[in-house]
Structures are given as C-alpha cells and as structure tokens.
C-alpha cells in the first residue's frame, strides 16, 4: 500500500444502526462487477477495501424469512468505516489498542471492524449468546475476553449491549462502552489516519470458547493477506462471476476470514443469513444459494447434516443447486457419511458431489492450512482400526470385514506452508504413520496475545505450530484422525474439556482431579461429550441426583448435552506426573461401553 496519508473528509450521511428494510426498497449487490477483479495481492485490509470500493459489489443481509434486510456495498462500507474511524480517533488511543465488538451478523459489525483498521486499532470479534439459559456464563466469557485483551473500547448492537455493559463492570481497562449508533453520534476528529503496515496486528481471534482462560490469536496483516491469497487463488480459484452465501458466525475464523474478508479482497458479493436463523430453518441458506446463483458456500459438517435432516423432500423441487461449484467443508472432523448423505439428498436439486471441497485449518494459522483439489469432490481411505489404535499406523483396507475407520483427504498445504507429522518425542514420521500435526508458514500466528505460557506450548522451535490435531500424510495429502488437545468440537463449537471438568468439581460430591471430559463420535459423525466422575456415593437416589445435576449444569453452561458416567475412586488413569490422561480415560470408556470400532480414535486428550 502507498505511504500516502488517507484524508477522511467525507460527511456522515446515514445512521449506523441499520433499520430493517422491505425487499421492494432495496436490491442485492450484483454478481458481476464493473471493476477488474484482483485476487488478493494487497498489503493490508484497508488497501484491499480501497480497491473493492471502486466497484458495485458488496455484502447483503437476509432475515429469517429470506427477505433482504440490508445491503452494504463495499463503496458504502469504505465511507462509513472512514467516518467511524474519525470518531474512534477522538478517544486518542495508542496505535494498536484493542477494540471488542460483539459480532452479530450485521452491517454494523463489518463497519466497526474496518473502522478499527482505518484508525490503527485492533478489533476482535466476541460471540453472541448461543443459549438463553447461560446468561452468567456468557457474561463471564465476555469479561474474560475483555480482560485478556485489555480492550480500551467495547461495542455491541442494542440487542446485546446489556450483556456487554454487565461484563464491563469489572473490566478496568475499558474507556468506553456503547452501541454503533452512540459511536456515530460522537464528534469527528479532524485527523489524518496513517496507513497500516503489513507487520502490524490486523485483529485478534479468540479461540476455544473458554470462560476462564480465553486466548487471543495475534494475526498480522501480512499473515492474513498471505492466507487469503492462498485461499482465493489456490484453494477456491475465485472467478469474476463467483458469488458466496454464508450462515457462519462472524466471530468464527471461517466466518470472518473465509466469508467476510476473502470475498472483499476478491471484490465478490456475499449473501448472509444469521446463524440462529440457519439453525432454525437451514432451507433458507439453500434458497439463497439457489435464488442468487451462489457458487461458493462453506459449512461445517454439522450444517450439512442439519440440511439433510431438516429439509423436506417436498422442498427440493424449488431448489436448483447446480450453480454451487465449491462446497467448502471444514472447522471440525469431516465424516464421509455426512457428505454422502447430503449429496444423495440434494442430487435431485442439482447438487454435484464433486463440488465438495474438504479443507483443514485453524485460527492459529489465520484460517486455512490445506485444501483438497477443487472439482474432485470428497476422497477418503479406509484404515484398519486395530492398527490405528495399537500401532498408530494408517494401514489401508479393502472391504474384508475387519473394523475400519474412514478418513477424508483434506488436501495439500497452501503455497509457502509445510505440514509435518511428529511422534511424542518430536521426531518426524514417515507417510501413513499417525502423529501430531505441525504447520509452518507465513500464515502462522505471532502468538497468543499477552499469554507467553500458552504461546510457548503452541509454537515450537522454527516457528512450527503444534495444531493439537492428530493425523497422517499419504501421497502428500493430509488426513486428520482426531484431536490431541483438550478442545471438544460439538456442532461447530469449541468447548474446553477443562472447563467442563472444573464445573463438575465445583459440586460438593466431586473432588478435585476426579473428573475427566472428552468427546466421542458415533458412526455418523455426531460428537457426544462424556463426563466421567470418580464417585463415592452409594445411594442410587444420590447418584442419580448427581448425574442429572451435572447434565443440567453442562447444558446451562455450554448449551450441549452430555453423558455422565460415575465410576469408583481411582478408576481414572493418570500420567507419570499425576495428571489425568483424557486419552486413556476415553479409551477406558470405550472399552467399558463396548464401542470400539464405532468411534473415532482420538477426539480429545493431553496436549
């Protein structure tokens, strides 16, 4: 980007609290642009937006009924973001100060995010509440992020400002809390906003959903632009006539990087449906793809499963999904059966199974690490379950009656990135040997913000990122077999096993270090959280009461169901240092419940 100072002198011409509009009053941004497409290649986000704003494409927001609610062309985004940046400058914050934004699927969030970058501030997206019964847990989660980031400003739409104000009561770092509308009412400061530098922090991405130890991934402009270029050029092969549709939350790395920032740096239009609206009626997402002829749309596997289960056969006749050329799949373990069921269900609506595009990534590497080859669909291999468990070897099998695990080909690393597999001693493994997945490349994070201890665990010498995942390489392609970290992914949500265990240990009947939580997957890929408790209670009534209470507490805190198993004292396995081994606890549970061969090999364990 040029070193020319950007002068912000455009008047504020509209309120920043968008009001719903009827579809007859507004039209979506077009698919075909008047601007020559440039596939990333920019130095910073703001330089990319400056270019995109010269065209006529942009973001479109739809309500639960599929009606167009708001339109935000890139030209208007630039204008509004610049004006908001001048108002943010009025706080006289040091460059690089953090700004927290509750990231609902709205134009306001996008404007605030880019306003922060124009003002030289570092935004980060905070989640919206996912479970109405977890008010206190949600506020605690927000408070943890505010304190961890030492945020100076916090913003939320009117629907969520109450949560934010409650969370901010104990956050001494904050200088101002408000809504986008209130920010828009503040006076503009007549300043020149300096352009961003590629080595500056672009944003923080919080991971794991932890309420006690949130970790903010530090992503620089350079890392972001490198990852975006790999995604749009090598992964998706974006074209001028592409259009995207998304239900993914803006606070998720796939939603933010893949479906907000990637479309902007390629100047294509996007149609959004709020995550909660998708969850209620996934048909609306498919309708957007069909009606607006969207070509690129990503989902987590559970989203495809939801479509397969919820969309009625009678609805298929109104859909034409033949336009959908890149059906990206990622963010959690990919089960081939989930993709097969989706393809079978929607083939009559024109969906081509070759559109499936499995990929692998994580926030600590900005977003994407590997992509399978576009246009080839989902490729998988059958692996001997016994060899996988006993020898950590991926031994290929034909259909001969032996127990098998089927794993999806997640493709090859993006240009400039390397993936290697190592054993417990850190030695690199050959192909078809199962071990820890490490990644090296320009997209890898600088570290976790203000968290040296967690950074040192994740980043190894040579700037190798320990992903916490387990997998193997075959003919240069990556296959993920499970997770080694203590994160359990349920319906696209990351839940820390430690948080569940600590919740259990708060009960008077449960002693410290006598609870172990992990995830197990059944044959169709559904993840279930299991909580094993060492229990001294003998009364059947008391044991049932404890089981029910723990299930209710987990649901209230995390919005998910769990299985509770009570076992005798000293049952849970421990490492040589006395720590609980979630991997061994999980294996013991599988053996006790006779589920061997029906479950994926490793879903959570010891880092």
Where are the regions a protein language model picked out?
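AMP-binding/adenylate-forming catalytic core of the ANL superfamily
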Residues: 290, 297, 441, 446-447, ...
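Conserved pre-ATP/AMP-binding loop-to-beta segment of ANL
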Residues: 57, 188-206, 212-213, 223, ...
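Conserved C-terminal "lid"/linker of ANL adenylate-forming enzymes
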Residues: 514-519, 530-531, 551-606
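Structural core segment of the AMP-binding/adenylate-forming
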Residues: 2-11, 118-187, 300-301, 306, ...
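N-lobe entry segment of adenylate-forming
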Residues: 1-72, 76-91, 95, 586, ...
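Conserved AMP-binding/adenylate-forming
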Residues: 325-327, 334-477, 485-487
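Conserved AMP-binding/adenylation subdomain of ANL enzymes
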Residues: 225-243, 253-295, 310-314
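Conserved AMP-binding/adenylate-forming core of the ANL superfamily
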Residues: 59-111, 131-138, 195, 219-225
